[in-house]
């Protein structure tokens, strides 16, 4: 069970001040469409729940029912913030229903399937009418009344259908509301803001920018033609009713990453979090600095408890997956709507067992639902592919910093003391102490690499050239991939120092003393002893800047591609976790991430993490594509999904 904190005296005082304002509500007749749970509150109070907790439970479940509120309260019994007076954040959106909504849903599905996820996929199709604003739990009823009152005043003043125009730019596609209708909607939003302030004392800031439905943004430049064509297929004149809808979210997690649990987990230690499939986890990158590889620190939506959890038990979820639906009103039709027709209904917060998790949540991290790409199975001109792969499991990580003392005697002779240690190690001219900065891979690391090679063979993928970092772990991984491909006697590995990882990560004031290619070949590793590197070891410097590392990786990758042109289509680079990003980002015409985001991304790439980059014709522009093999997941290390990790949203 995770450890919990206690509210501070200041927080307790704020809570008392906030809830001192709560006054008994008079009974009112229920009206269709109102966002109201007075009778539910009375029932909860009669059951003995404190007023503040009952109001928080109703606000956190959208006032759906007494049972839902009770379930929320019981599941949050260990939540250290259960009695925190911090209110939720609310937002007012226009959402489409009817034939146009279905067309937009089709666009969402097709664009994600063809081009991968972009920022627009984080939220359902909508028009933003205001910024997020806070509202006390005790005033949510009045907020709903404010919306109903405003809609009733404006219902006959909107154009039907709402006129929309398609707009595209290099990194944005959307449907914009024509100016006259947009002005009417802005006045409607301003009227709601005034009504809400009058009834609830909240401050609502109407949306000041052009009103629009975002279709796509923050996507790869190469995807623009495809996305534009899909957007042009949307008939904006289709029948559509628009509903003014209120959603809320927990303000504490507004800037967190939203994840969803796909496998159950029972805690083994006091600081670990229990996982239930279907639950959502909030994760802040700022809280991950001290976590072990393969683990993250997060907070459960269902319980409010925080703790450590294995990274490969969860998958990314849309930002809006945890939002709460509070109610909606049609702005065009005379009937009110309390149900949403778009999407899979998760925003209505049905219990997890009713959401059809097996149908709505693809297990993208553990097992990607795709057909292997058969790179050389199609007739005609072949596209050029660059495969980048991380090395296998390394000895110093498995057996610790002082692993040498476990398997070398006083005379420097290697002695195998564990089944996961290799039978023998290559001789080093500088002595066995050179292994401290240049560790080999384990027996399991060799197996991982052979598995990848065998998978490439089964998918009919032909590798024409192999390059690798000078680190022994990378050379051994490349050699074992070739063994799995049954090419160890036909292909030679070109050891390229320019592919070494960011030298800032090397401990001490000197670079590793790598084994020369001639000695690697003498140790029966398939190394090309005649290869002349593009960036020799003498050009590498200790503690290089991030910009220098990124530039070096891009430069050597371009030179490798140029060197292999007309000599085969497919290049394999075996290097480090950072290489999957550093060697492919600028090839796609993208700007490098900042160093902080880069480091966070690298943490997510497991041993033998594998990505595929394909040239678009002969344009010199490359794009990430589905690899020809399935991902490899092992231990607590997070499974690797290239779309989620490498694609810049």
UniProtKB/Swiss-Prot annotation:
The active site is at 390, 391 (tele-phosphohistidine intermediate), 576. The modification Phosphoserine is found at residue 20. It catalyses: O-phospho-L-tyrosyl-[protein] + H2O = L-tyrosyl-[protein] + phosphate. Residues 27-76 form the UBA domain. InterPro entries: His_Pase_superF_clade-1, His_PPase_superfam, Phosphatase_SH3-domain, SH3-like_dom_sf, SH3_domain, UBA, UBA-like_sf, UBASH3B_SH3. Residues 380-649 are annotated as: Protein tyrosine phosphatase. One of its GO terms (molecular function) is phosphoprotein binding. It is an enzyme of class 3 (hydrolase). Disulfide bonds: none annotated. Pfam families: His_Phos_1, SH3_9, UBA_7. The keyword Cytoplasm applies. One of its GO terms (cellular component) is cytoplasm. Residues 254-319 form the SH3 domain. PROSITE patterns: SH3 (PS50002), UBA (PS50030). Its main location: cytoplasm. Homodimer. Interacts with JAK2 (in vitro). Interacts with CBL. Part of a complex containing CBL and activated EGFR. Interacts with ubiquitin and with mono-ubiquitinated proteins. Interacts with ZAP70 (ubiquitinated form). Interferes with CBL-mediated down-regulation and degradation of receptor-type tyrosine kinases. Promotes accumulation of activated target receptors, such as T-cell receptors and EGFR, on the cell surface. Exhibits tyrosine phosphatase activity toward several substrates including EGFR, FAK, SYK, and ZAP70. Down-regulates proteins that are dually modified by both protein tyrosine phosphorylation and ubiquitination. This is Ubiquitin-associated and SH3 domain-containing protein B. It comes from Homo sapiens.
């Amino acid at each position: 069970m995770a450890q919990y904190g206690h509210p501070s005296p200041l927080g307790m005082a704020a809570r008392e001040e906030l809830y001192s304002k709560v006054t008994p509500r008079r009974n009112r007749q229920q009206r269709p469409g109102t966002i109201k749970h007075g009778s539910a509150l009375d029932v909860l109070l009669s059951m003995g729940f404190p007023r503040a907790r009952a109001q928080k439970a109703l606000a956190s479940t959208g006032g759906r029912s007494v049972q839902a509120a009770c379930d929320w309260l019981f599941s949050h019994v260990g939540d250290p913030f259960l009695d925190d007076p911090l209110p939720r954040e609310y937002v007012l959106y226009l959402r489409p229903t009817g034939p146009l909504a279905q067309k937009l849903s089709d666009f969402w599905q097709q664009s994600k399937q063809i081009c991968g996820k972009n920022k627009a996929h984080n939220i359902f199709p909508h028009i933003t009418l205001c910024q997020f604003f806070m509202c006390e739990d005790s005033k949510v009823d009045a907020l709903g009344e404010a919306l109903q009152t405003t809609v009733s005043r404006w219902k006959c003043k909107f154009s039907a259908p709402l006129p929309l125009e398609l707009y595209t730019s290099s990194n944005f596609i959307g449907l914009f509301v024509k100016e006259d209708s947009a002005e009417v909607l802005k006045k409607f939003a301003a009227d709601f803001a005034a009504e809400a302030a009058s009834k609830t004392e909240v401050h609502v800031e109407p949306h000041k920018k052009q009103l629009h439905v975002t279709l796509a943004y923050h996507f790869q430049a190469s995807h623009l033609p495809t996305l534009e064509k899909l957007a042009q297929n949307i008939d904006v004149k289709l029948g559509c009713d628009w509903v003014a809808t209120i959603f809320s979210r927990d303000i504490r997690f507004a800037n967190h990453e939203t994840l969803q649990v796909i496998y159950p987990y029972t805690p083994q230690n006091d600081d670990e979090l229990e996982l239930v499939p279907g639950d959502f986890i909030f994760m802040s990158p700022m809280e991950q600095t001290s976590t072990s590889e393969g683990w993250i620190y997060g907070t459960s939506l269902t319980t409010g408890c925080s703790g450590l959890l294995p990274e490969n038990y969860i998958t990314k979820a849309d930002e809006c997956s945890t939002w709460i639906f509070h109610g909606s009103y049609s702005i065009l039709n005379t009937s009110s709507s309390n149900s949403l027709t778009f999407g899979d209904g998760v925003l209505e917060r049905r219990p997890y067992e009713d959401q059809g998790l097996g149908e709505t949540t693809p297990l993208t991290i553990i097992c990607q639902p795709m057909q292997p790409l058969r790179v050389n199975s199609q007739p005609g001109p072949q596209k050029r592919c660059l495969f980048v792969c991380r090395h296998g499991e390394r000895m110093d990580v498995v057996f610790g910093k002082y692993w040498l003392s476990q398997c070398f005697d006083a005379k420097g002779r290697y002695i195998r003391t564990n089944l996961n240690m290799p039978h023998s190690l290559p001789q080093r001219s500088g002595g066995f102490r050179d292994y401290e900065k240049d560790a080999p891979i384990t027996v399991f690391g060799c197996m991982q690499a052979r598995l990848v090679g065998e998978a490439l063979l089964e998918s009919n993928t032909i590798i024409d050239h192999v390059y690798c970092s000078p680190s022994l772990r990378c050379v051994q991984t490349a050699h074992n991939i070739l063994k799995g491909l049954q090419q160890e006697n036909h292909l030679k590995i070109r050891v390229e120092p320019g592919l070494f990882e960011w030298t800032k990560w090397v401990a001490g004031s000197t670079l590793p003393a790598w084994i020369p290619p001639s000695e690697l070949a003498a140790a029966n590793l398939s190394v090309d002893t005649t290869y002349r590197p593009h960036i020799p070891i003498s050009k590498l410097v200790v503690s290089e800047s991030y910009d220098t590392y990124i530039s070096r990786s891009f430069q050597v990758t371009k030179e490798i591609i140029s060197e292999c042109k007309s000599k085969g289509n497919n290049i394999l680079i075996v290097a480090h976790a950072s290489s999957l990003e550093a060697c492919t980002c600028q090839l796609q015409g993208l700007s490098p991430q900042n160093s902080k985001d880069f480091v966070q991304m690298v943490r997510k790439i497991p041993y033998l993490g594998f990505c595929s980059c394909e040239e678009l014709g002969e344009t010199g522009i490359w794009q990430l594509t589905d690899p020809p093999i399935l991902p490899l997941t092992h231990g607590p290390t997070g499974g690797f999904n290239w779309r989620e990790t490498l694609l810049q949203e």
